[in-house]
Amino acid sequence: MPDTVPIDLGRYSVFVPPDPFEDHVGPFYFRISGDARQAGSVHCVLPTHARHGNYADSVHGGAILAFADYALCLVAGRAADGGTNSSFAMTVSIAVEFLDAGRVGPPLEATGEPLQVTGRLAFARGSVTQEGRTIALWSGVCRHVARTKAMARKDEATPALSQAAPQSVPAGFDLLATASAYSRHIGPSYARKESDGATLIQPTLPHMCNSGGVLHGGYMMSFADSAVTRAAGLVTGMAPTTVAFAAEFLAAGDATMPLSTRVEVPRHGKSLAFLRGLLEQDGRKLLSYSATIKLRQRAPS
């Protein structure tokens, strides 16, 4: 479907059952045309609004990561079940390269190509575009399970989530009161500068979960992207922009306790910084990630 053709969202669908994170930051839309196992059969759309913005009034990198993750799961999951929506796709790993800035206002679009489907895994790659411009390239691996099995696990976990204790932030962390519109829309986060990076903490909320009742992969990457740009800015004193991001999902999280992430900046120069981090919840490692950040001089205040 050409990006320059007006999009009739009435011909598109949203996930059923509802996905709290996608509904909160989206909605995200998709349409399947023809054989879901073929390249280009799945077309995804994210209408962009002010809440998706970063400091430069472009679409936040975390929003693009979340949309790429959505597209990966759609392309890989529907290839695994032939378009029947009987599979639940969970991201194992994903890599995204940012090629251009997305503007707030026009919709983002994504499509992809299933590469291989095995008994447990599905591999796919694709792109995110806007008005004919390629904004990002993505590739990744999903694990696919029966949707009925994933929903049963959600039902088992619901009582524990409803009895979760109030969450608190340790002393020494400062609220990021001037965070970007997208980051604030997701929820408050707190930071502490380290000698070689930063540590960030974010209390979790129900809208950060996916339809399976665990923390959404797009949410975790959104938090990680905010963390790497914050750490790069604190260490270098320059304005950061993510140009590449890769993540490996190690375990599932839930909305009962805060997430924390320690970001290191092993090396940086005048124009690039290289970062890595680990996202944890109550000592459990959930996400390992790395990023390349473009640096530029900050505009005079």
Show where each model-derived region lies.
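Terminal targeting signals and extreme-terminal segments of soluble enzymes
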Residues: 1-301
